[in-house]
Design a protein with these regions (language model features):
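Pan-zinc metallopeptidase signature
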Residues: 207, 211-239
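Surface-exposed intrinsically disordered loops and tails
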Residues: 183-196, 228-239
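Active-site rim elements
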Residues: 53-56, 198-206
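Boundary at the C-terminal end of the N-terminal hydrophobic targeting segment
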Residues: 15-17
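Sec-dependent N-terminal signal peptides
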Residues: 3-13
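Acidic/His-rich structured neighborhood in mature extracellular/periplasmic domains
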Residues: 46-186
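Active-site metal-coordination segments of metallo-dependent hydrolases
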Residues: 172, 185-191, 204-209
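N-terminal mature-domain "stem" immediately C-terminal to a signal peptide or N-terminal signal-anchor/transmembrane
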Residues: 19-59, 63-67
Length: 239
């Protein structure tokens, strides 16, 4: 478990409540493939993570997503991705975060119907981004969705002994089974009283539960959840 904890906390600890300085620029989208035709804005984050956004997304929100990704990948802010193995993996899969104005619009449908890669694990919508409340539950989903992408595209592949998403395959799967009060391949009708992770989305399979568990573990360590309002709001899923 000590090795698992070290791997988990090695990359995401310095995000502040508000991004004060952003050292990126929003460039025009140069990706001409059909899947990306709905995006006009692009940011390259440290050469290994891309942000694509529609024209209706403000530059401030696009830059916020880029800053969050940079903080997670380069915690000491020296301009170099902290984990070179994660960097290589993200590059190999062309990891990215697409930002859509709303669910089901033309840009989203075009992307969903034409994207054929392994670099996407989550998406963001305009209404989920608040640069003034970084990662705050119910206000800004940027930290959550970027963490999901880095974990899913990066960590689960680079460190399978720690983070493989199959049951009985990794330190993380064993830890999650304890947190859920047992091993459940689908969502149980009721979680045991001993469980402190009890996500009840019936559409979320075991691997999905793993990705969510990794997020909760990381942001708990980061301290993002350390206020009474947040603790109360998430108690149905995480204690």
């Amino acid at each position: 478990m000590k090795k698992l904890l070290l791997l988990l906390v090695a990359f995401p600890l310095l995000i502040s409540a508000q991004q004060n300085t952003v050292c990126f620029t929003v460039d025009p989208n140069q990706n001409s493939t059909t899947a990306f035709s709905g995006f006009t804005k692009y940011v390259d984050v440290l050469g290994c993570f891309s942000i694509y956004a529609e024209s209706t997304i403000t530059d401030a929100k696009v830059l916020h997503a880029a800053a969050v990704a940079a903080e997670l990948l380069d915690n000491n802010e020296d301009g170099i991705v902290d984990d070179p193995l994660i960097e290589v993996q993200l590059i190999s899969e062309s990891a990215l975060m697409p930002i859509f104005f709303q669910d089901g619009n033309a840009a989203m449908n075009t992307f969903a119907n034409n994207y054929n890669g392994n670099g996407v694990s989550a998406i963001l919508y305009n209404g989920e981004i608040d640069p003034t409340q970084t990662g705050h539950w119910g206000d800004d989903a940027t930290v959550e969705e970027v963490i999901h992408t880095i974990n899913h595209v990066g960590h689960t592949n680079v460190y399978p002994a720690a983070f493989s998403m199959q049951a009985n395959s990794s330190l993380m799967s064993s830890a999650m089974d304890v947190a859920r009060g047992g091993q459940f391949m689908s969502v149980p009708n009721n979680y045991p009283a001993s469980a402190w992770y009890h996500y009840d989305d019936q559409t979320c399979d075991y691997e999905c539960m793993m990705i969510e568990y990794m997020y909760w573990a990381i942001v708990s360590y980061m301290g993002i959840l350390n206020d009474p309002q947040t603790a109360q709001g998430i108690s149905d899923e995480w204690e």
